[in-house]
Amino acid sequence: MKKFILASGSPRRKELLELANVPFEVVVSEVEETIGAYSSPADIVMALALQKASAVAETHEESIVLGADTIVTYDSRILGKPKDAAEAKEMLQLLSGKTHEVYTGVALMSKEKTVTFYERTEVTFWELTEEEIDVYIATKEPLDKAGSYGIQGKGAIFVQHIQGDYYSVVGLPIARLVRELKQFDSGASHA
């Protein structure tokens, strides 16, 4: 297999690739994450993943580059990473007692080809008290995460139900990625 590069500094994505025993190196993409005029959350995450992969692939032509992006949506509103604790609190209050969607887009890119895909997962939160939200925000955990929570961390206690790929909510749909990567590297046509 060609050298595999993760175009992300996300510790969660690194952990998931290690969990799947995928050898890789990290080259952080310096792409500014801006959401343009896309028609759907799926289009947004796939476009951002592709931008990240493309930026790194330009200087690593003999490698397979992985770009990924995750967003949370509720009621047609996109919830990215909060800019501060106040915005994190607003997001968590918005999600309290409700079901929201998490989209993770993935792009695999080499000199020969590019494959993009996404996973959509529904997450339902318990009703959260203001105190629970404040205590969680004080941990600083939500400040670098889309939707202001980490399902794999202390934010797990907010989750009542999940429908879809848990690891996609963490940041990378690892089971599907491994299958896509095998097909990508084998030269098989992608359906």
UniProtKB/Swiss-Prot annotation:
Keywords linked to the UniProt accession: Cytoplasm, Hydrolase, Nucleotide metabolism
GO biological process, one term: nucleotide metabolic process
Localization terms from the record: Cytoplasm
Organism name: Bacillus cytotoxicus (strain DSM 22905 / CIP 110041 / 391-98 / NVH 391-98)
Entry cofactors: a divalent metal cation
Principal place of residence: cytoplasm
This protein's name: dTTP/UTP pyrophosphatase
Primary enzyme class: hydrolase
Family: Belongs to the Maf family. YhdE subfamily.
